[in-house]
Amino acid sequence: MQQLEQDFPGNDIDDIEDLISAEDVKPQERYQNKKSVTVRAKKRVQIKPETDAEEKPTPRPTIYESVIPGTQKVFVKTWGCAHNNSDSEYMAGQLAAYGYKLSGKDEADLWLLNSCTVKNPSEDTFRNEIESGMSNGKHIVVAGCVPQGAPKSDYLRGLSVIGVQQIDRVVEVVEETLKGHSVRLLQNKKVHGRRVAGAPLSLPKVRKNPLIEIISINTGCLNQCTYCKTKHARGDLASYPPEEIVDRARQSFAEGCCEIWLTSEDTGAYGRDIGSSLPELLWKLVEVIPEHCMLRVGMTNPPYILEHLEEVAKVLQHPRVYAFLHVPVQSGSDSVLGEMKREYCRKDFEHVVDFLRERVPGVTIATDIICGFPTETEEDFEETMTLCGRYRFPSLFINQFFPRPGTPAAKMERIPANLVKKRTKRLTDLFYSYEPYAQRVGEMYTVLVTEISHDKLHYVGHNKSYEQVLLPMRDNLLGTRVHVRITSVSKFSMVGEILDDERDWTRCAKKQEAPMELTITGRNRDKLIQRYVGIALVVGSLAFLLQLLIRFL
C-alpha cells in the first residue's frame, strides 16, 4: 500500500471539528425549532477560473504537455480532522490509479495541500507551506476548508483549488495545473437539484494506515456556532445514504482493514436530511463488521445525541464497537454556551455523560474546551473548571479561542491574551493533576493492534474502551487481536506485555477478494499504468499515421 506523508495516523483523536449566524434565541428553543428541519441547498455563485494575469504569482514552468498522463510525482499534505484525512486518501487514491507517483515534497513536481480552517495556527502553517512550495518551483493545488470558505484570500490568487465536494475531480485539476493553468472547482454537488454529501464513497483510496478506513458519513451540520469557520466551508447537513456507507465498510474489510472510523462535522446529526438516523446506520454497520474487527463512532454534539441515547448506549455495548464517544462541551457555563449558540445547556451535556457512564461499562468520554471565549467571565470559567474536575475526562482537548475571520465571534470584544493564557494553564494543570490509568497495573485486556506510536518504538493497540495500550514491536503483530497484561501506565496510555503465543493471535475474518478498482496497490496499480501507457501509444501511433496520410494527400 502506498503511503502518504506519514506512515500511520497519530494516536491523537483527530476528528475534533465543531461547527454561525445570529438571532438571540435560547439554546433549547433553537434546538426545538430544528427538530424537523429539512436542509435545502443554498444557491452559491460559481467562482470562475482566474484570468487576470496581473493578480497571479509568477507561474511555475510548464512540465507536462505529454500525451501520456500521470507521469509526474505528487506530494500530499493534510491538516485537520479525520474528515480531511479521508478526503486526502481519496484524492491520493485517484492520482495513484491514474499513474501518478506519491512522493516526498523534495522530489515532487506538484504539491497537493489539504487545509483546515478551525484555528489560526493551522491556516498559518498552510500559508507558509504554499510559499515554500512556490519558492522551490513546485506546482501547487490547494484543497480543504480554507480555500472553500475563503476562496478570495490574497495568498490563494492564481492557485488551483479543489473544493471539499469536488475531490473526485482531483486528476483533471492536477493535469491542468501541470500544464500551467489555474483551475477552481468550488461548486456543491447536486442530484435532482438537491445538494448531496459529496464525492462517491466508492472512489479508490491510498490509506495513510492500511488497517484503518475513515468513512465520512455526512458533511456539514445543523448548528450555527458563532466561533466556527468550518460552517462556511462544509455548509449545512448533507448525509450519505446508509446503503452507500455500508457498502464502503464492507469493501474496506474486504481490502484488509480491521478498524473503521465514522467521521463528520457532527455524526449525531446524521440522517436528519434523508429520513434516517445515527442508530439506524450503526445497527446496519454492525451486521457487516467481521469478527475481531472494530468500529469507532466519531464526534457528536450533545443536542442530536440526546434523542438517541438509549439506542446509542446499546450500540456502544456491542463487542465489535468501541465503548467510546467524543462529545465536545466547549464550556461549563450556560451563559457562554448561549453566546456560542451551542444549542444545549450544561445539564444536557451532564445527562449524556451520566447516562452513558451508567449504561455502557468502561465507556470513555472525550470532550473539548475553548478557553477565553470573548464573553467568558471569571465565574464562567470557574464553572468550566468545576465541570472538568467533576468528570475528570481521560481525553480533554483544551483550545484557546481564535477569532476566525467572518464569524460573529470575531466581532466580539476579546479577553486580554494574558488572561486567556492564564485560564488555559489553570485548566491544563487540572487535567494533568489526575492519572486516569493509575490503578490499571496488572489488569488484563484484549486489544486490537493497528498503529505505530509517534516515537516509532511501540505498536499501539486499543481495548474495548478505546484506551491506548503500547506494545513491543514484534513481527506480524499489526492487525491482530491479542491478550495483554498492563505493566506500567502514563497520563495518556498504558504499557502492556503480550500474554499469547504468536499462533494464538487472532486476525479479522479472512478478507474477500476486492475489486481491482478499489485496491490501488502493487500489481493492480502497475496494470493501470500499463493500460494508460498502452492507450497513449495507440493514440500516438494513430496520430502519426494520420499525419503521414495528410502529407501524402
UniProtKB/Swiss-Prot annotation:
[4Fe-4S] cluster 1 binds at C81, C116, C145. [4Fe-4S] cluster 2 binds at C221, C225, C228. The chain crosses the membrane at residues 533-553. Its EC number is 2.8.4.5. Residues 207-438 form the Radical SAM core domain. Belongs to the methylthiotransferase family. CDKAL1 subfamily. This is Threonylcarbamoyladenosine tRNA methylthiotransferase. The lineage of its organism: Eukaryota, Metazoa, Ecdysozoa, Arthropoda, Hexapoda.
